[in-house]
């Protein structure tokens, strides 16, 4: 297994602050409003990784086969698989805030996805790499999950426990967590910027000299992003999920945990690899795509019930169920 120490430090700087925000205690309440979580889990773990792999094979082995070097096609597919195999963790809170999402529910969604990611990321990536006839380096995959998910998550959980202290402190623990995350957030931004600069330093010549290749890589990424969003968003609309849950629910699957994808791509294939290039293009594509989807979600807010309307409907259904049939007549 190969680990780039500089990249590892930068990834930790990016990931650790967001892991402090993860609250596993919130998972105790998932049974209260399960619809958004059901959609999130199904789309993120049973649909998204497989559609991304399928799009990669479709475009790079068939539709774009005459436009790219066949020797590089496998690496591009691998990069797409890595991007599609894990939902976003950090930027979800930004997208949720921009769509006026339920911050507490978003936290529950992120916490649940992080738990699943610890156990599901490596097997899903190994399965999809194997199906596409790529070598499955289990040692590096498992090491990457431990380094870039388990260790930051454990450190974040321990930090949160120290900050919150004992229960019943009147919310002071939550305030301490908020102050701490605000204080370390600049390190996360610096880590992100340094990682992007590092990647652009190694991949900049391709980005500047081969715009056609960049456009070809962007095509399946764009189709995947918009397709996954509208799948989750439509499911939430059909199930009458309130907008402050539906919008973050759809955006979580649309966005990728690109920090993990970057780290694993570099560990498996190297800084100069086609897989690493795909993760760089993923970063370039993601922000404008997500902003366009945030704008769409805000414009369609009135198509969804509000949280208050859902609670009223649920209360009405409960009351109706409690009234004997003779009384309803």
Predicted features by range, described:
Residues 1-254, 258-329:
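Alpha-helical transmembrane segments of multi-pass small-molecule/ion transporters
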């Amino acid at each position: 297994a190969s680990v780039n120490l500089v990249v590892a430090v930068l990834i930790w700087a990016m990931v650790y602050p967001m892991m402090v925000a993860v609250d596993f205690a919130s998972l105790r309440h998932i049974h209260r409003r399960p619809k958004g979580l059901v959609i999130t889990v199904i789309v993120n773990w049973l649909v998204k990784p497989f559609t991304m792999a399928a799009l990669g094979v479709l475009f790079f082995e068939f539709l774009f086969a005459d436009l790219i070097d066949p020797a590089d096609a496998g690496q591009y597919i691998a990069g797409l698989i890595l991007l599609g195999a894990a939902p976003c963790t950090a930027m979800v809170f930004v997208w949720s805030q921009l769509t006026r999402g339920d911050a507490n529910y978003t936290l529950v969604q992120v916490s649940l996805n992080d738990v699943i990611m610890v156990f599901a990321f490596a097997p899903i990536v190994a399965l999809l790499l194997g199906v596409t006839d790529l070598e499955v380096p289990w040692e590096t995959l498992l090491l990457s999950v431990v380094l870039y998910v388990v260790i930051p998550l454990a450190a974040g959980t321990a930090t949160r426990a120290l900050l919150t202290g004992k229960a019943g402190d009147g919310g002071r623990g939550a305030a301490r967590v908020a102050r701490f995350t605000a204080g370390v957030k600049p390190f996360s931004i610096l880590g992100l910027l340094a990682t992007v600069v590092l990647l652009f330093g190694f991949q900049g010549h391709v980005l500047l000299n081969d715009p056609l290749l960049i456009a070809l890589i962007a095509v399946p990424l764009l189709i995947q992003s918009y397709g996954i969003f509208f799948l989750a968003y439509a499911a939430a609309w059909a199930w009458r999920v309130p907008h402050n849950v539906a919008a973050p629910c759809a955006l979580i699957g649309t966005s990728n945990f690109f920090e993990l994808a970057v780290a694993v791509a570099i560990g498996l294939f190297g800084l100069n690899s086609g897989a690493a290039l795909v993760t760089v293009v993923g970063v370039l594509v993601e922000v404008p795509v997500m902003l366009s989807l945030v704008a769409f979600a805000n414009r369609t807010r009135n198509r969804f019930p509000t949280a208050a309307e859902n609670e009223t409907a649920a209360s009405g259904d409960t009351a109706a169920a409690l009234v004997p049939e003779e009384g309803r007549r």
